[in-house]
Structure formats: C-alpha cells, structure tokens
Swiss-Prot record:
It is a lipid-anchor. It comes from Xylella fastidiosa (strain Temecula1 / ATCC 700964). It holds the Pfam family YfiO. It comes from the Bacteria. A lipid is attached at residue 27 (N-palmitoyl cysteine). GO terms for cellular component: Bam protein complex. Disulfide bonds: none annotated. This is Outer membrane protein assembly factor BamD. Part of the outer membrane protein assembly complex, which is involved in assembly and insertion of beta-barrel proteins into the outer membrane. InterPro entries: BamD, BamD-like, TPR-like_helical_dom_sf. Residues 1-26 form the signal peptide. Part of the Bam complex. NCBIfam families: OM_YfiO (TIGR03302). It is found in: Cell outer membrane.
Length: 293
C-alpha cells in the first residue's frame, strides 16, 4: 500500500517556524545572560569598573550586581557594592543608591569606606526631590516636605562629626552650609506667603523661627523687615520699632526702611517653589552663601 505524503497547512507551518524562532532566540538570550557566569571575580570587577569609567552607569550597575550575586563575600564584592551605589547615584537612581548605601552600612559598619558612603548618601538625598516635583507639588508653600534635604543635611553632619579628618569632611561642611541657606530661604518664602495673604501673626511666627534657627543667613534682614511689616499691621508699635532699629543699625539700605514697596513678591511661576532662585526678597540681588558656625 502506497502512503500518501503528509502536507502541512500554512497555519501548521507558521506555528512550527514560530516555535523554532522562539527556541533559537531563547538559547541566544540564555547564552548572553550567562556570559559573565564563571568569570573570575577580578575580571568581572575590572569589566564593571571599566564600564563605569566610560560613563556607562547602567552597564556598570548590571555588572556590579552580577559580581555581588556570584561572589557574595570578599574584598572585590565590598568594593563592588560601593561603586554600584555610585553608579546608581550617577544614573539618577537616587532611591536605589540610598538603599544600596544603607545595606552596605548595615553589613560593614566598620569598613574604611563608611565615611564615603555617608557622604554619598548625603549627595543622593540632596537630589531625591527634583526641581520638577518642587514646582508642581503644591501651591501652599507652608506644606512642603523637606525630609529628603533634611536627611541629606544629617548625612553630611555625620561625616563632619564622626570623620572630621576624612577627605570628604570639607565638602560635607560646604554642602551643609548650602542646605542650611536653602532651609532659611524656604522659611523666608513661607513668610512672604503669609505676608501676601495678610496673615500677620503667621508671618511674624515664621520670621522669628528663621532668625532663631538660621542666624546669620543671607535672609536674616529680610526676616527682620517682615517682622516690622507684620507688627505694623498688627498695631504693635514697640515691636515694629524694634525691627526698624535693627535694620537701621545693620542694614540701613534695606528697601523697607526707605518706604519702597516691600516685599517684592516672586513672579507667579516662582510662587510654586519655595526653593526657586537665590534672590533676596528685599533687593532682587543674588545672595552669597555664608559660612555656618
């Protein structure tokens, strides 16, 4: 008996071709995925470090993670964890960087790179709140979340307090000064927010808080002028005169003393962001950063 040849329908043929393609692709991906498997730890570290030096942060992070997964312990692994956190920071993955740093600090609390990791955590926390989010977060300047920059300040303070002789202490102090002035500017903008809404008691409260918490900041005399303005409207002549006397002695050219329209409220777009710009509400001039003691 003669057997008839078997013919595949177009649908069956397409299914066979598709299955073959998936099998080949899967094998290729598996080969690519496992390309670093079995590579000596020093070679894997060199590969990741080279990628990082070239600015390939994503590739470096992937290679460092593979090294850490394949070799959980050892000096190369410890250094890979440090550089992986840096690669994440440079990639803008600040939350991931902070998580990696926290894991390292918990695992190796006495490691010689601990000062650097606190410093890097400060840099990462400083950048967690993006400018875009600051602008669209809320119109109410008094309800912003300063937890990330405050944590950054604490990280830099840890470097300065615990490791004053480390190579990162000098810049940590500079970063603290910049953050401190930013916090003072935030308080000044909140004060202006209340002045603009004729909330005189609230404005005086925030101005006093600024002066007590951030003395000698670039915004101290604007805060004194805000006190004078608020107390004038509240009918407290004694306190208003005290504010005027302080300005006459220390900032005689302040616009509030000259009867000029003060304060000059930020433009509409800057009302969204208490950190926007570095200009004094009094003069419109850019303020210089002052050293904190």
């Amino acid at each position: 008996m003669i057997q008839r040849p078997t013919f595949f329908s177009p649908i069956h043929l397409l299914a066979v071709l598709l299955a073959t393609f998936i099998l080949i692709t899967g094998c290729h991906r598996e080969t690519k995925k496992n390309a670093d498997d079995g590579m000596p730890v020093e070679h894997l570290y060199d590969k990741a470090h080279t990628l990082m030096k070239k600015g390939n942060w994503a590739g470096a992070e992937l290679s460092f993670k593979r090294l850490i997964a394949q070799y959980p312990y050892g000096p190369y692994t410890e250094q890979a964890m440090v550089e992986n956190a840096y690669a994440q920071y440079k990639s803008g993955k600040h939350d991931d960087a902070v998580s990696s740093i926290d894991r390292f600090i918990r695992t190796y609390p006495t490691h010689h790179n601990i000062p650097y990791m606190y410093y890097l955590r400060g840099l990462s926390n400083s950048n967690r709140d993006t400018i875009f989010l600051r602008k669209v977060w809320s119109l109410d300047l008094s309800r912003r979340d300063l937890s990330a920059p405050q944590q950054a300040y604490n990280d830099f303070k840890t470097v300065l307090d615990r490791y004053p002789n480390s190579r990162y202490a000098t810049d940590a102090k500079k970063q603290m000064t910049e953050l401190r002035n930013m916090f003072a500017q935030y308080e000044m903008n909140v004060t202006l927010y209340y002045l603009r809404r004729t909330a005189w008691v609230a404005a005086a409260g925030r101005a006093n808080f600024l002066l007590e918490t951030y003395p000698q900041s670039p915004f101290q005399y604007d805060a004194v002028a805000a006190l004078g303005e608020a107390y004038t409207h509240l009918g407290n002549k004694t306190l208003a005169d005290n504010a005027r006397q302080v300005l006459q002695t220390n900032a005689p050219d302040h616009p509030w003393l000259k009867g000029k329209k003060w304060p000059k409220y930020p433009a509409a777009i800057r009302k969204l962001n208490p950190f926007a710009g570095e200009k004094s509400a009094a003069t419109g001039q850019t303020n210089a950063v002052v050293n904190s003691n």
